[in-house]
Amino acid sequence: MSVLVVGISHKSAPVALLEQLALDGPGLHKLIDDVAASEHVTEATVIATCNRLEIYAEVDRFHGSVEEVSRLVVDRAGERTEAMLPHLYVHYDDGAVSHLFQVVAGLDSMAVGEGQILGQTRAALNAGQEIGTVGPALNVLFQQALRVGKRARAETGIDRAAPSLVSAALDRSRATVGELSGKRVLVVGAGSMAGLATSTVAARGTASVTVVNRTSGNADRLAEEYGARSATLAELAAELAVADVVISCTGATGTLITRDMVAAATVDGRELSILDLALPHDVDPTVADLPGVSLVGLTDLADELRDSDAGQEVEAVRQIVTQEVAAFLSARRQASVTPTVVALRSMATSVVEAEMERLTSRVPGLDDDIRAEVLHTVRRVADKLLHQPTVRVRELANETGAVSYAAALAELFALDQEAVDAVTRPEGLT
């Protein structure tokens, strides 16, 4: 079994195509279920964010599983296969581990080093566990990836060195409304991105911050945390009319802020800066044509964030990821031989027990003390004979290459494959 990643992100596809792949909760669960139901897949989950969709699966073969999983992504986008495939990327086995660690460490994010990916990865793990499609392999992999992501941020300044998506968008808004100090800001949404937006603008001396969300309870909680006020979605048009800056980042699947709403809000000729950080977009793109209105979307920010240089911090995180990948793969290779080693020692124990029974039947009057000494001696002989091969096979398992030393050991000692498979695979790799 090996891990397969099939994905698409801001690095491989335009935002317009990513919008077609946006998933709500039920849609995400259905995709995970569909992947898990594929013929060659035994475990599955999906990382879905505003700028990436990545399917992680434990598979029993490469080519068949790639075709199956890629087809699910193509079908989700509603695109022709030939139009979609060039934007997909595939990572397998060791490469899949390396890719996930880079993603969770923030190296692959649109805003390098951003911390939201940690929560999004945890959400992917939780979703798979809730549905029942995440088993030991993906659980171990994702748990370790989360530890790597936390280590990267604890030991470096990667999350502070690079600008966040919100900060970059606010910097772009200066051309229209100037500094945020004294401005009225409207945040639409109450998820993790909205939380980041609210905390960021609240720290910049704004005159007021208002949080609007479809679910009033979520808006109330977010507003209370940052000293803002909350409003309902029914009040959106009225709130637009008094805002200087709008940051929209909901999970809605349709246009939330229409051209007519913005036109009505700016009828007096005032300037309005709108930052649309949602995928699919919350704001009608044509509002950018209205007088005094500026619109900044994810497409506008992509190149700017890609070119930002976190310098030494990025390099430090890369080194951490390299170390962690090597350690994880080493532990995984050693764990892969454990069932064979356990089965071999179990076979040796069975042989010793059978021979002792044979000795007892042939020498019925054997003294108990002598019998115990013989048993002890035979066990020591068996242990010494097996010690070097089992230690060496663990050492050799650390070496990369195509040779399967566990398979060779099983073949040499004629181990029953069912006995090997019956050994529980360790789940505590660190």
From Swiss-Prot:
TM spans (from-to): none
EC number(s) given by UniProt: 1.2.1.70
Top EC class for this record: oxidoreductase
Annotated GO biological process: protoporphyrinogen IX biosynthetic process from glutamate
Feature type site, description Important for activity: 99
GO molecular function: glutamyl-tRNA reductase activity; NADP binding
A Pfam family of this chain: GlutR_dimer
Similarity comment: family membership: Belongs to the glutamyl-tRNA reductase family.
Known partners and oligomeric status: Homodimer.
Protein name, entry field: Glutamyl-tRNA reductase 1
The organism of origin for this protein: Nocardioides sp. (strain ATCC BAA-499 / JS614)
Phylogenetic placement of the source organism: Bacteria, Bacillati, Actinomycetota, Actinomycetes, Propionibacteriales
